[in-house]
């Protein structure tokens, strides 16, 4: 299905305006900016406008969308999360509520926390389960801060500074600990790191695995490297370049109004500048611009002068700046309409990527569930893979990618 509908999601709305989208675009041509924002995060509205164009897409998503976990945690003392931002703390609680049920059976053997950062997840886990935690993190400064937290709270949490990009783990202490650890967990490990996590955990025959994947595009390869044999046998991975992998997580549900306004203004300027550049260099392909930290005194004219300098373009003395800025605003609305079509495929792509990992775990002898550990407004990256090593796992297949 994703392959059949590839022309509707595999394009860059900033630089491309595919003609075959005309029928789908006509469905939302009357929507203003506020309505387009609302459409962007509402599957029911997306189905209302585009179900005729993509009926199988919304049917498949409805069938595959996992349910949300509703497990309640016991009352948690305030001192355990005083330095954790609210939304991050909600994510950690949701993850632990789902994952610690399996970990309780692991006894006093240590758990592994992968891509630990400061070990916020590990601290809650060890408090809930009375189970030691080994928190593995490659940034030494985060390890030091996390260890200070754990020592202050007298929790059995040990940090190991190790290069988790490599397989096997380079640190001898981490390697020996991993062999003994029955429970492995990773909350929002990025791209290659969560793939390394799955390979390493299964190689060490972890009893239970809990993974919330994130940032699928953060990898060295130019295209997605499928994990399970079923996905490897399809043509889809070869089409999933970094742009497609970014699409799977391209969501601004958690962005504040100010952040959205700043992003919209930046796009207005970039598109307005591109319109200006095309009048000076007609027919030339789009030229990338580096990211720019905007200052309070910036305006459209100053932005264009900066961009022209980067492109080594001499601007004419007289330019109708308001006209080009207005053109940029209109182009951004067109971009939003094109993205409204692409964004219908965000969740299906993400589900496919998660199912690839789930089936890989089944192939390694695990029984697997896929569920949501928090609401999408807390984090749009709310998929959680829970795997339990089971000799009968092969008899409980998930829907294959």
Q: What kind of feature is each model-predicted range?
A:
Residues 1-72, 295-303:
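A short N-terminal interaction module
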Residues 89-106:
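Conserved alpha-helix/loop element of class I SAM-dependent methyltransferases that forms part
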Residues 118-130:
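Conserved SAM-binding loop of SAM-dependent methyltransferases across substrates and taxa
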Residues 107-115:
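Conserved class I S-adenosyl-L-methionine
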Residues 132-137:
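Conserved SAM-binding motif I beta-strand of class I
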Residues 1-20, 165, 181-401:
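Class I S-adenosyl-L-methionine
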Residues 146-147:
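Conserved SAM-binding loop
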Residues 154-164:
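Conserved SAM-binding strand-loop segment of SAM-dependent methyltransferases
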């Amino acid at each position: 299905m994703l392959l059949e509908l590839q022309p509707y999601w595999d394009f860059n709305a900033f630089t491309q305006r595919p003609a075959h989208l005309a029928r789908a675009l006509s469905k939302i041509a009357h929507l203003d900016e506020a309505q387009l924002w609302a459409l962007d995060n509402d599957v029911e509205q997306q189905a209302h406008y585009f179900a005729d164009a993509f009926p199988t897409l919304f049917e498949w998503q409805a069938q595959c969308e996992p349910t949300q976990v509703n497990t309640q945690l016991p009352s948690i003392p305030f001192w355990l999360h005083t330095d954790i931002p609210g939304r991050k703390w909600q994510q950690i609680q949701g993850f632990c509520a789902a994952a610690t049920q399996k970990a309780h059976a692991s006894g006093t053997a240590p758990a592994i926390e992968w891509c630990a950062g400061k070990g916020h997840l590990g601290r809650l886990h060890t408090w809930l389960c009375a189970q030691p935690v080994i928190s593995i993190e490659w940034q030494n400064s985060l390890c030091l801060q996390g260890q200070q937290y754990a020592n202050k709270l007298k929790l059995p949490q040990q940090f190991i500074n190790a290069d988790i990009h490599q397989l096997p783990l380079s640190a001898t202490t981490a390697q020996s600990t991993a062999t003994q650890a029955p429970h492995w967990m990773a909350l929002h490990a990025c791209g290659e790191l969560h793939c390394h996590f799955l390979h390493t955990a299964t190689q060490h025959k972890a009893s239970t695995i809990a993974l919330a994947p994130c940032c699928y595009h953060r990898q060295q390869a130019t295209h997605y490297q499928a994990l399970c044999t079923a996905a490897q046998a399809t043509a889809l991975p070869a089409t999933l370049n970094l742009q497609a992998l970014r699409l799977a997580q391209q969501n601004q549900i958690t962005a504040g109004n100010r952040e959205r306004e700043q992003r919209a203004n930046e796009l207005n300027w970039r598109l307005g500048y591109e319109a200006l550049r095309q009048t000076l260099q007609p027919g030339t392909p789009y030229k990338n611009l580096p990211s720019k930290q905007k200052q309070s005194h910036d305006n459209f004219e100053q932005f264009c002068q900066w961009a022209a300098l980067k492109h080594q373009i001499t601007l004419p003395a007289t330019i109708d700046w308001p006209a080009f800025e207005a053109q940029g605003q209109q182009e951004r609305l067109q971009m939003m309409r094109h993205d409204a079509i692409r964004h219908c495929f965000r969740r299906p792509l993400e589900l496919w990527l998660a199912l690839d990992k789930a089936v890989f775990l089944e192939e390694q002898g695990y029984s697997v569930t896929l569920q949501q550990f928090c609401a999408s407004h807390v984090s749009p990256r709310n998929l959680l893979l829970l795997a339990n090593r089971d000799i009968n796992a092969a008899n409980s297949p998930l829907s294959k990618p």
